[in-house]
């Protein structure tokens, strides 16, 4: 007899940092130098390619609902909804809460025009680092200038952290999203936990 039982695949999946959740929670620091780390699991990430000024670029800009960023560091939209991060003159990353329908929407908008819309949701993990000490943790191994004058809220760049390439997105005054390749998630989490440990001790006057 055939087994017609339907299996919901979402019940079987595991995010890149799922096995590290307890370690991240245990590393949380409270107080004046507070800092927390968590995974934002199963976000939708779409890679967009289109040449500025082209019909395809205009179609994708309209379909995202927030446009496309025009220069390095720019983000169209924000973390509360759909956001599009600038990766290159004709390359962008759309980031949103889980929404599989976005892929069909963007592919339909591009149609037969030159360009690409690819599902990259499994390509990168998303880590959220928050708190007054978050920027200090990042500065231990990130070469980018993180001063608010140079790296304001809702800016994003490609940089490195703990010697691996990441996308770094400042989502608030004291909050950052770090997007390493999924295969580097464990390395990144362990490095951040180690960097956070300093701030659990009393500050030396």
Swiss-Prot record:
pH-dependent activity: Optimum pH is 7.7 in potassium phosphate buffer and 8.0-8.5 in glycylglycine buffer.
GO biological process terms held by the UniProt record: sarcosine catabolic process
Protein's cellular compartments: Cytoplasm
NCBIfam families registered for this protein in UniProt: soxG
UniProt catalytic activity: sarcosine + (6S)-5,6,7,8-tetrahydrofolate + O2 = (6R)-5,10-methylene-5,6,7,8-tetrahydrofolate + glycine + H2O2; sarcosine + O2 + H2O = formaldehyde + glycine + H2O2
Activity regulation text: Inhibited by Zn(2+), Cu(2+), Cd(2+), Hg(2+), Ag(+), p-chloromercuribenzoate (p-CMB), iodoacetamide, N-ethylmaleimide, CN(-), o-phenanthroline and sodium lauryl sulfate.
Keyword Nucleotide-binding (UniProt): no
One annotated GO molecular function: sarcosine oxidase activity
Assembly: Heterotetramer composed of subunits alpha (SoxA), beta (SoxB), gamma (SoxG) and delta (SoxD).
Biological function: In the presence of tetrahydrofolate, catalyzes the oxidative demethylation of sarcosine to yield glycine, 5,10-methylenetetrahydrofolate and hydrogen peroxide. In the absence of tetrahydrofolate, catalyzes the oxidative demethylation of sarcosine to yield glycine, formaldehyde and hydrogen peroxide. Can also use N-methyl-L-alanine and N-ethyl-L-glycine. Is very specific for oxygen as an acceptor.
Family indicated by similarity: Belongs to the SoxG family.
Temperature dependence (free text): Optimum temperature is 37 degrees Celsius.
GO cellular component: cytoplasm
Protein name: Sarcosine oxidase subunit gamma
EC number(s) reported in the record: 1.5.3.24
Lineage, top ranks: Bacteria, Bacillati, Actinomycetota, Actinomycetes, Mycobacteriales
Keyword vocabulary terms for this entry: Cytoplasm, Oxidoreductase
